[in-house]
């Protein structure tokens, strides 16, 4: 079978020498070709997340993990469906909304209480519309 580690590594397509690292897959699978990398320090993996994406993830988490189960369900379903569609200014408005006490948010989105002027935003209207239109997918009779 295999007599050395080098034979094992070469059989699985990964060869390591002192100066060169080659990662490759067979041309038969996915059309990949041999890739030579002389200096690994030149490789930069771009896995940074933009500030707007960080805000989206934060708001999605905060929408699903509230103090009231009702808000978890209503805001969580809204955020899951719509957070990627919101503009940066809408995200800022939504962030401000989520900083308010849960009972207030609940009453505002269900229109059970008057909404203060600073929270009368397009985002609140989107949330209200979402909550009015069967957000959890239950069928009404």
Swiss-Prot record:
GO biological process, one term: tricarboxylic acid cycle
GO cellular component terms given for this protein: mitochondrial matrix; mitochondrion
Transmembrane segments annotated in the record for this chain: none
UniProt keyword list: Chaperone, Mitochondrion
Keyword Chaperone included in the entry's annotation: yes
Primary subcellular site in the record, as a coarse category: mitochondrion
Pfam families: Sdh5 (PF03937)
Further facts: This protein may be expected to contain an N-terminal transit peptide but none has been predicted.
Record text on subunit structure and interactions: Interacts with the flavoprotein subunit within the SDH catalytic dimer.
Main function: Plays an essential role in the assembly of succinate dehydrogenase (SDH), an enzyme complex (also referred to as respiratory complex II) that is a component of both the tricarboxylic acid (TCA) cycle and the mitochondrial electron transport chain, and which couples the oxidation of succinate to fumarate with the reduction of ubiquinone (coenzyme Q) to ubiquinol. Required for flavinylation (covalent attachment of FAD) of the flavoprotein subunit of the SDH catalytic dimer.
Family assignment from sequence similarity: Belongs to the SDHAF2 family.
Protein name (Swiss-Prot/TrEMBL): Succinate dehydrogenase assembly factor 2, mitochondrial
């Amino acid at each position: 079978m295999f007599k050395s580690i080098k034979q094992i590594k070469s059989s699985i397509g990964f060869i390591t020498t002192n100066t060169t690292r080659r990662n490759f897959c067979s041309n038969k699978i996915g059309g990949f070709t041999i890739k030579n990398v002389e200096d690994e320090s030149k490789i930069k993996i771009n896995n940074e997340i933009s500030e707007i994406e960080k805000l989206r993830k934060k708001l999605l988490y905060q929408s699903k993990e509230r103090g009231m189960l009702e808000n978890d369900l209503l805001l969580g379903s809204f955020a899951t469906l719509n957070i990627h569609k919101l503009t940066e200014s809408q995200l800022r408005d939504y962030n401000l909304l989520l900083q308010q006490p849960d009972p207030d948010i609940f009453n505002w989105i269900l229109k059970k209480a008057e909404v203060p002027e600073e929270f009368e935003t397009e985002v609140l209207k989107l949330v209200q519309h979402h909550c009015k239109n069967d957000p959890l997918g239950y069928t009404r009779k």
